[in-house]
Amino acid sequence: MWVRSLETRFGSIVGASGCFYAIRRHLHRPDFPADLSRDFASCIIARRQGYRAVSVDDAVCYVPRAGSLDREYRRKVRTMARGLSTLWHERELLNPFRFGRFAWMLASHKLVRWLVWLTWPAAVVGLGLLAWADPRFWPLPAAAGVAIAVGWVGWWWSRRGSAPRLLALPGYALAGAVAGFAAWMRALGGAPLAVWEPTRR
């Protein structure tokens, strides 16, 4: 929420929390496609019509944790794929000549964050090329391989119960990276995106 507080001071937040947000009635668009992310789009719709979306620090919402890492993975894939599809639907908001710093905030906070998973394969390839050029650097890709293997073990362990922290953190990071890849494939593939009933809080 710290980032959203900064965005509010800077002008407008670029995405609302689906569990806890409100929008003015005359800005609400009932015709908005159901398979897109309405909470994310609410901020974009407000900005398009000359309003801004803000984060209220005094608002408190308790959100239960996902029951397992697999559920968290599915949640990440779903929300990211819907977010990407929504951003494409409202892509003109990325035009800095029309929407100024909001376009920059939208690209840096959303699009760049949804591309973070690309750093994993890029790092592995880069380390492999470095080691190929100079054998002294072979420990680096080897360490990366071990880290990824530990992540897989942590993810697998979470299906049996609570994983030790040394395994849980790499498992969570790996699940997030794989979810990023899966979300992009789903969004680019044009597959229908699930519509679900939000958890009551």
Predicted regions and their residues:
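Membrane-proximal intrinsically disordered regions of secretory-pathway and membrane-system proteins
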Residues: Y51, V195-R201
